[in-house]
Amino acid sequence: MKIKFLGTSAGWPLPRLGCSDQICTSLDPKDKRTRSQALINERLLLDVGPDTYRHLNATDINPTTIEYAAITHEHPDHTYGLWDLGHIYNSKQIKVVIHPSTFQKIQKLFFHKEYNVLKTLTATPITAGDLKVSLLPVNHTNSSFGILVQEEDKRLFWAPDFKSFPDETTKALAGIDLIAMDASDLRITSSGHQTIEEGVKLGSQLKAKKVYFIHIGHRTLPHKELEKYVREHGGTQFEIPYDSLEVIL
């Protein structure tokens, strides 16, 4: 499974407008982050935020190969790129994998003739070429999910926004090959997001083989320091991805 991290930031890109903290003034290109999004096997998009056009206009991406897009929840940083996704020349009609409760909230964003909307209930896999895609509930909004992608015996879970997992999700993810999870804050707790400190504990609890922190906010650390932090506190299986990173699972 080929995973390309197109974007890795939280709801607002880094650097934040008008901000002069150590992340937002960093000269390290890895600290320049756009909204979290990934491309799997060049055919499946995970989330469709407002940076989608920018991501798909990269020179090493052929947008006409994209056939599917899966949505975690209704917030703008995960859905506002639908306008651009429906206007890719010479492409097949995009199939959007979405939970009915999420679709109900954002259906006015869709132009139904431009998409094939595949509404799916949790834990009901949809076949996307050589991939199986299913949604597992997470605690964020009342219609938020993580995206489980499986290719043969390899499993990826994409969960950019959550405070915690319901028990059934935790059980389903035991021993996951790679989990990409919320890193909005380092230690500052909020009602809708886990901290990186909590994520290190969760990754260890799941016995995940690889943990990549995404949805990175500016109340964390610069890339190099954050990479050092998660490895010292969690181990070598913990990673801080950056925009454009490719991983083979």
What role is predicted for each listed range?
Residues 164-248:
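Cap/insert and terminal regions of metallo-dependent hydrolase folds
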